[in-house]
Amino acid sequence: MDKFTKLTGVAAPMPLVNIDTDMIIPKQFLKTIQRSGLGKNLFDEMRYNQDGTEIADFVLNQPAYRQAQIIVAGDNFGCGSSREHAPWALLDFGIRCVIATSFADIFYNNCFKNGILPIVMPPEVVAVLMEDARKGANARMTVDLEAQTVTTSDGQSFPFQVDSFRRHCLMNGLDDIGLTLEKVAAIDGFEKAAATLRPWV
């Protein structure tokens, strides 16, 4: 998992509430267990017409936001079914941070496990960030996980809070496997001691 320390990039405004996981990655794309390749179908039914052509006014199809790395969204982002493909699709597209007033719990947890930083901000702050995101590619937002701040293109800075353990994992690029590998020496020591104490096992 890639480390997340500080990100400066284009933020895409998505002022919608209840963006669910089926909107993020529709069910017909869930047949794979590969984490790569899902980005092209991110928000598929919002990005494309039935004939496969792009819907021009969808934010991620607009030239200013095609390389967006941050999404600023409305309330209850990631609700619906608990598919882990949703953060996989966001990450594969290039999204490393989602800012919203609230998240569905399972989606929120899955983001941290897949290298995406979900940030909860109060509505008045999200409104400011949404307006800044509407400035397009010339306005670049900065998310500093170490300082726990989001800074707009004009220098306004807003604090946020992240659980210290999750912050540690993101900043060090540690998923569940990485966390286990940090304890390899302790695990080996335990197994050797257990083998000595209980050789019949």
From Swiss-Prot:
It holds the Pfam family Aconitase_C. GO terms for molecular function: 3-isopropylmalate dehydratase activity. Gene3D superfamilies: Aconitase, domain 4. SUPFAM superfamilies: LeuD/IlvD-like (SSF52016). It is an enzyme of class 4 (lyase). Its EC number is 4.2.1.33. One of its GO terms (biological process) is L-leucine biosynthetic process. GO terms for cellular component: 3-isopropylmalate dehydratase complex. Catalyzes the isomerization between 2-isopropylmalate and 3-isopropylmalate, via the formation of 2-isopropylmaleate. Belongs to the LeuD family. LeuD type 1 subfamily. This is 3-isopropylmalate dehydratase small subunit. It comes from Cereibacter sphaeroides (strain ATCC 17025 / ATH 2.4.3). The lineage of its organism: Bacteria, Pseudomonadati, Pseudomonadota, Alphaproteobacteria, Rhodobacterales.
